[in-house]
């Protein structure tokens, strides 16, 4: 039976810990007092430096704006104030402490994750000589991995999160066939996974809406701050010890101020509407991840990923109407419908040409900075490359999202309820094909297929993966196999139209392949878990 919901991930930035109402009132009053003092001292400079702040009537969101804004500078509280406040309220948690807690938990979670993966691989492929099944993996995860994490963290939510993370990343069939390696990770990039537990105290995620602010309470309860600071480590402002008895969970304030300024906040569909429904309790979350920011300027920030089940949007599609999507180089995406003349194609492969330019620019920067930017570490030397990579990733994601929306609109307009796509997993193993090498090098086809598949499933359209064998050589009219029409022939003749040797049927090569893919007689291939 098909599910009526689809799992979606919402990404929000953690602003700061949210304490009791009394502590929050003291902090807000102190910020307002300092803002008034700064306003009286700098009356002449306020209009020039804080014009945006005064127009928007809200506080700055980016770090550049905060550094240039006198209001934000004045509202920034120092360590002396927090030390004094910590003496009055010992249970209060502030940003420096919560950041250190996240860092310690992230490091220990990554260690358990890597250790469990290595031991699981050893038990199956070294000791067991490759003889294992899904039940034995589940037995190891329940008995060894979960027990080890629960003993270390004294937290069932993190232990269950690590177990599910290892289970999803440990692909037994791919490891047996040597299609992939062991998916170990670094502690800087590893998230802190938490799974909602049933029963008991402080086991779930309590989400509340206080003065239109998104507040989530999560069961982190096992760390507390030592009063004594180690004299041998004066650079560390806080030192932590692990306690056996879990105190109250930590409340976190999530960033929604920038989203509230957008027009989408007042709409009933979209990401902003889903965030509002989570805040109001309409959508429930059972899995979250705390992760360090990955973009430039967000390395010191912490992000929270919430997994929610969103109901599918009913567009009145017909499952008996079958469509097909062909992936190519000259035309990146071509859509066709079985026994129909409607078609849709994205003719200009902007992403392919953009990636080629990015690779060329990357080579120029590497050659240019070979003897420059030296003496300050690899991070400083490769900073231009990192900036270029992030720009290209943002462009790629936006372009793929636009293509996915256009394809979804085409199939919804034609009431298509089933879409067949090529299973391109075999392209990982074929190194002798020029087409495969070219496609993998400049075009993230897997990411594009996943995005299109997710977008179509949102509207209740079923996805079927079919084998890509001879879809470009077969005539969509008579079914004759034209062996001459291979990729070398198409490349030599500058990607000509397809012409059948038997019935002289002539059509665009990518559209002919899309028609073959939309054939309901093709056998579906199930992807390996």
Swiss-Prot record:
Annotated phenotype, changing residue 118 to R: Almost complete loss of target dsDNA cleavage
Enzyme superclass (EC): hydrolase
Positions with a binding annotation for Zn(2+) 2: 475, 478, 500, 503
GO molecular function per UniProt: DNA binding; endonuclease activity; metal ion binding; RNA binding
Activity modulation notes: Target ssDNA cleavage is inhibited by EDTA. Activity is maximal with 5-50 mM NaCl, is less efficient at higher NaCl concentrations.
Oligomeric form and interacting partners: An asymmetric homodimer. Guide RNA is probably required for dimerization.
UniProt similarity note: Belongs to the CRISPR-associated endonuclease Cas12f family.
Protein name in UniProt: CRISPR-associated endodeoxyribonuclease Cas12f1
């Amino acid at each position: 039976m098909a599910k009526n919901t689809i799992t979606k991930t919402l990404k929000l930035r953690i602003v700061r810990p949210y304490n009791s109402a009394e502590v929050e009132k003291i902090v807000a009053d102190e910020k307002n007092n300092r803002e008034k003092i700064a306003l009286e001292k700098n009356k002449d400079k306020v209009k020039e430096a804080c014009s945006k702040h005064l127009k928007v009537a809200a506080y700055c969101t980016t770090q550049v704006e905060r550094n240039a804004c006198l209001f934000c500078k004045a509202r920034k509280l120092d360590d002396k104030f927090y030390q004094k406040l910590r003496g009055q309220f010992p249970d209060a948690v502030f940003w420096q402490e919560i950041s250190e807690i996240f860092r310690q938990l992230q490091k220990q979670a990554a260690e358990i994750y890597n250790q469990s993966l290595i031991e699981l691989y050893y038990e199956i492929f070294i000791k067991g000589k490759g003889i294992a099944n899904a039940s034995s993996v589940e037995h190891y995860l329940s008995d060894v991995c979960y027990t080890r994490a629960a003993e270390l963290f004294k937290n069932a939510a993190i232990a269950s999160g690590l177990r599910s993370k290892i289970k999803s990343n440990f692909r037994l069939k791919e490891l047996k066939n040597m299609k992939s390696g062991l998916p170990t990770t670094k502690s800087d990039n590893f998230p802190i996974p938490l799974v909602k537990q049933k029963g008991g105290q402080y086991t779930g995620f309590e989400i509340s809406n206080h003065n239109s602010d998104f507040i989530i309470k999560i069961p982190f309860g096992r760390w507390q701050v030592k009063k004594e600071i180690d004299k041998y480590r004066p650079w560390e402002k806080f030192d932590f010890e692990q306690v056996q008895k879990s105190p109250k969970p930590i409340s976190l304030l999530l960033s929604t101020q920038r989203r509230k300024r957008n027009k989408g906040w007042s709409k009933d569909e979209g990401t902003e509407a889903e965030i509002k429904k989570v805040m109001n309790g309409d959508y429930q979350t059972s899995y979250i991840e705390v992760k360090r920011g990955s973009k430039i300027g967000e390395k010191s920030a912490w992000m929270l990923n919430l997994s929610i089940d969103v109901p599918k949007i009913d567009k009145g599609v017909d499952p008996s109407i079958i469509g097909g999507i062909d992936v190519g180089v000259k035309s990146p995406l071509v859509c066709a419908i079985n026994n129909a003349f409607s078609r849709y194609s994205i003719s200009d492969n902007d992403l392919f040409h953009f990636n080629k330019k990015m690779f060329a620019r990357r080579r120029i920067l590497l050659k240019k900075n070979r003897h420059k930017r030296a003496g300050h570490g690899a991070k400083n030397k490769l900073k231009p490359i990192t900036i270029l990579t992030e720009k290209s990733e943002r462009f790629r994601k936006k372009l793929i999202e636009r293509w996915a929306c256009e394809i979804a609109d085409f199939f919804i307009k034609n009431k298509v309820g089933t879409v067949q796509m090529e299973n391109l997993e075999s392209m990982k193993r074929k190194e002798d094909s020029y087409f495969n090498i070219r496609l993998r090098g400049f075009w993230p086809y897997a990411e594009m297929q996943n995005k299109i598949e997710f977008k179509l499933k949102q509207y209740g359209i079923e996805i079927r993966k079919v084998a890509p064998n001879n879809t470009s050589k077969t005539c969509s009219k008579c079914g004759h196999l034209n062996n001459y029409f291979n990729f070398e022939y198409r490349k030599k003749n500058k990607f000509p139209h397809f012409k059948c040797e038997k019935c002289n049927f002539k059509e665009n090569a990518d559209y002919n392949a899309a028609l073959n893919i939309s054939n309901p007689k093709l056998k579906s291939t199930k992807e390996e878990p």
